């Protein structure tokens, strides 16, 4: 069967070959070309059928080819087998023949015809155009990046940015082209030219120009140094005058005025010695000015100007000073000139020195440190003692001049007795000081205390003497008045209190003053103390026993800081120091109660807090409407049941911040005015919120900063000069350089978009 099939196939193949020969010998048409393609397909099927005749696949034996000298048509070399066959290679042998011109035209027509690509979508085309336009505009705008960055980082911008060159042209160049136009200007210039006057005001005169040309470099340097020195001295004198003008001390101005008067007198004396005639003329001028001032009263603040200044003197400091200067000038002019000799000046100086007593100098030497309060009190006591001493040492001539002092013989005897008592007390105190040597007090403090004791005793004695003399005179004149009251300070007992705890003065009658001598004669006897002191002893007996041994001390910083505030029970009784803490707290509470007795501050505060809490609470919504489901009208209220039904309770809000703070009210309302000044976005120069907060926390007011720093902090960001035209900036004004972003091409800046376009083009071409 297989052989029969094979023979049939061979017969069919042979017939097909014959047909192929016929077709090759005759020209082919278009229909014949289609049939030829079908024959090739059939021939291919025949070969496949022949290959499948044997069920077994034959082994292909390897063939070996060797190079030989003879080349036959059956042995073709395989050179260039890897290269592709081009259409030009096939058309090469057909060129000389003209019969194949039509075939050549057909082939060239087929070669020239190509498939056209599909056009892009309209949106894609517009996107590409936008990218190209963006690249061009970004390249042009990037030239201004440096300028914009510089203007943003600048602390202050001053427009116009172009600064006009400041050139100082001399007046000759300015008026060179100017001409007189009006008839008045022409007449003025004609007069100037006729008289050969300079029309302009040159900086340097011809003489100065000649001197500059004649001056050498060294002379110019010396001249400049002299001018600099003169300017410096002038500035020093001006600063000194300003400082002296600001001094408000009356004593200083009095001394300056005295010095000026003395200097004027000395100059006048010198002028009188040198030129008597000129001195007489000067004296006549001064006397004439004094007379004119006394007649006219020009500087007595009685004119229109002075009255207008007097109205504003209460508010204006300059007006007040002007009025004072007027009065001072009036006093100076109306004062008669008195020439004081040198002997009188020396005598006046001696008198001033004699006014200072010796005891004041002694106290100043013994005083520890510059304590002006103690020195002032010492000087006051010393002056009183000095007056008493002067009254004792009056000469006989003074006694004759004052016959009224003849009655003072009796008080002098009493004074001697008091001085003796003073000596006794001083000796007793010295002994007590020797016994109390173990106390932690320095030698200097003891000296100060003794000096203070002496001064206080002298003061008390002098007061006693003067008041007793005064009372004795009054008793002689009016003996019926026996209850006159005088101010008198209690004499210091043995247990001297500190200066801070001294008792105030109180009134004493004449009977008490008569018994004063008896009490002074018994220094060791204890006097009855007030009732408050007894209560203090009962409360704290230990402190009272210690206080007996203490003596009068100066002000000490440690004692002042450690002592508590005393509780004053009565103004006429001595103050007591409460050492118990509960007593001090009770007194403080009592004082606060007395201060706020009429005002119930706590209740008002609690009421205000309750109102604030109620105002901030979420309120319920009442949806009841009158007339719905029941009668409505005037004076008809909806029932409570209906209200409860239509009442929507609001949810409770978060707890208040001041819930556990009874003494504080914290407002939780949002302040709209403050919210307008809050910043939601971080400003440009700052990179972190802490930097911005730190700058906001710093104060910029003039209270906390210097004037220069305040002006710098509050300087405006942009300043425009008035009257100047602000023109737009151009590329010629600024050296603009393009930034690196413009160098990147458009397609490179977005490669994904570019690849997307390429894929779409390929798909369209394949389709």
UniProtKB/Swiss-Prot annotation:
It is found in: Nucleus, Nucleolus. Residues 23-49, 338-554, 730-767 are annotated as: Disordered. Residues 753-767 have a biased composition (Basic residues). It comes from the Eukaryota. Residues 342-355, 486-498 have a biased composition (Acidic residues). Residues 398-433, 503-538 have a biased composition (Basic and acidic residues). InterPro entries: SSU_processome_Utp14. Residues 317-346 form a coiled coil. Its main location: nucleus. Ubiquitously expressed. The keyword rRNA-binding does not apply. GO terms for cellular component: nucleolus; small-subunit processome. The modification Phosphoserine is found at residues 29, 31, 37, 52, 77, 81, 451. The modification Citrulline is found at residues 431, 586. GO terms for biological process: rRNA processing. There is a cross-link at residues 122, 447, 518 (Glycyl lysine isopeptide (Lys-Gly) (interchain with G-Cter in SUMO2)). Keywords: Citrullination, Coiled coil, Isopeptide bond, Nucleus, Phosphoprotein, Ribosome biogenesis, Ubl conjugation. Citrullinated by PADI4. The mouse genome also contains the Utp14b gene, an autosomal retrotransposed copy of this X-linked gene. Evolution of autosomal retrogenes from X-linked progenitors compensates for X-chromosome silencing during male meiosis. May be required for ribosome biogenesis. Interacts with DHX37. Belongs to the UTP14 family. This is U3 small nucleolar RNA-associated protein 14 homolog A. The lineage of its organism: Eukaryota, Metazoa, Chordata, Craniata, Vertebrata. The gene is Utp14a.
């Amino acid at each position: 069967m297989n052989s029969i099939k094979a023979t049939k196939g061979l017969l069919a193949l042979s017939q097909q070959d014959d047909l192929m020969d016929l077709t090759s010998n005759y020209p082919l048409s278009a229909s014949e070309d289609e049939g030829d393609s079908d024959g090739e397909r059939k021939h291919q099927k025949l070969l496949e059928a022949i290959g499948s005749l044997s069920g077994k696949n034959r082994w292909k034996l390897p063939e070996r080819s060797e190079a030989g000298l003879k080349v036959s048509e059956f042995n073709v070399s395989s050179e260039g087998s890897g290269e592709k066959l081009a259409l030009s290679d096939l058309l090469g042998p057909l060129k000389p023949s003209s019969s194949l011109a039509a075939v050549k035209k057909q082939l060239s027509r087929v070669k020239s015809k190509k498939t056209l690509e599909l056009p892009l979508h309209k949106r894609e085309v517009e996107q590409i155009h936008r990218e190209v336009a963006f690249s061009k505009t970004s390249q042009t705008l990037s030239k201004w990046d440096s300028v914009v960055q510089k203007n943003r980082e600048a602390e202050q911008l001053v427009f116009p940015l172009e600064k006009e060159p400041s050139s100082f042209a001399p007046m000759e160049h300015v008026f060179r082209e100017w001409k007189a136009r009006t008839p008045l200007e022409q007449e003025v210039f004609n007069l100037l030219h006729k008289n050969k006057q300079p029309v302009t005001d040159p900086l340097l005169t011809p003489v100065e120009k000649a001197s500059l040309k004649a001056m050498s470099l060294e002379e110019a340097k010396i001249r400049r140094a002299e001018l600099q020195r003169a300017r410096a001295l002038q500035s020093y004198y001006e600063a000194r005058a300003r400082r002296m003008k600001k001094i408000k001390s009356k004593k200083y101005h009095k001394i300056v005025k005295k010095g000026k008067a003395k200097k004027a007198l000395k100059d006048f004396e010198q002028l009188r010695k040198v030129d008597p005639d000129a001195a007489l003329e000067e004296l006549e001028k001064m006397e004439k000015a004094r007379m004119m001032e006394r007649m006219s009263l020009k500087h007595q603040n009685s004119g229109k100007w002075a009255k207008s200044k007097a109205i504003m003197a209460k508010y204006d400091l300059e007006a007040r000073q002007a009025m004072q200067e007027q009065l001072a000038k009036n006093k100076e002019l109306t004062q008669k000139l008195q020439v004081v000799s040198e002997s009188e000046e020396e005598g006046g100086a001696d008198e001033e020195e004699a006014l200072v007593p010796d005891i004041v100098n002694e106290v100043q030497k013994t005083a520890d440190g510059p304590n002006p309060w103690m020195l002032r009190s010492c000087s006051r006591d010393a002056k009183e003692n000095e007056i008493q001493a002067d009254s004792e040492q009056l000469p006989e001539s003074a006694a004759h001049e004052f016959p009224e002092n003849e009655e003072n013989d009796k008080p002098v005897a009493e004074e001697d007795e008091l001085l003796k008592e003073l000596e006794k007390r001083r000796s007793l105190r010295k002994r007590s000081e020797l016994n109390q040597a173990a106390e932690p007090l320095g030698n200097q403090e003891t000296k100060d205390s003794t000096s203070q004791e002496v001064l206080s005793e002298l003061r008390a004695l002098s007061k006693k003497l003067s008041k007793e003399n005064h009372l004795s005179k009054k008793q002689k004149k009016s003996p019926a008045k026996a209850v006159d009251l005088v101010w008198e300070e209690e004499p210091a007992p043995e247990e001297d209190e500190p200066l801070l705890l001294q008792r105030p003065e109180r009134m004493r009658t004449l009977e008490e003053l008569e018994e004063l001598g008896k009490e002074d004669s018994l220094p060791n006897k204890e006097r009855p103390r007030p009732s408050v002191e007894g209560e203090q002893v009962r409360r704290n007996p230990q402190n009272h026993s210690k206080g007996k041994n203490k003596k009068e001390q100066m002000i000490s910083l440690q004692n002042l800081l450690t002592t508590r505030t005393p509780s004053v029970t009565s103004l006429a009784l001595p103050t007591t120091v409460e050492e118990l803490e509960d007593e001090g707290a009770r007194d403080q509470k009592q004082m606060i109660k007395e201060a706020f007795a009429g005002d119930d501050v706590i209740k008002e505060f609690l009421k205000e807090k309750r109102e604030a809490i109620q105002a901030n609470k979420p309120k319920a919504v009442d949806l009841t409407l009158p007339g719905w489901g029941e009668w409505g009208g005037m004076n008809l209220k909806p029932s409570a049941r209906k209200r409860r039904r239509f009442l929507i309770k609001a949810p409770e809000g978060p707890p208040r911040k001041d819930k556990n703070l009874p003494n504080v009210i914290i407002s939780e309302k949002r302040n709209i005015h403050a919210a307008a000044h809050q910043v939601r976005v971080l400003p440009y120069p700052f990179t972190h919120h802490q930097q911005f907060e730190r700058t906001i926390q710093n104060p910029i007011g003039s209270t906390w900063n210097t004037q220069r720093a305040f002006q710098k902090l509050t300087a405006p960001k942009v300043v425009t000069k008035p009257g100047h035209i602000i023109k737009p900036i151009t590329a010629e004004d600024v050296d603009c350089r393009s930034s690196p972003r413009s160098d990147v091409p458009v397609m490179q800046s977005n490669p994904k978009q570019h690849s997307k376009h390429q894929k779409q083009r390929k798909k369209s071409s394949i389709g």
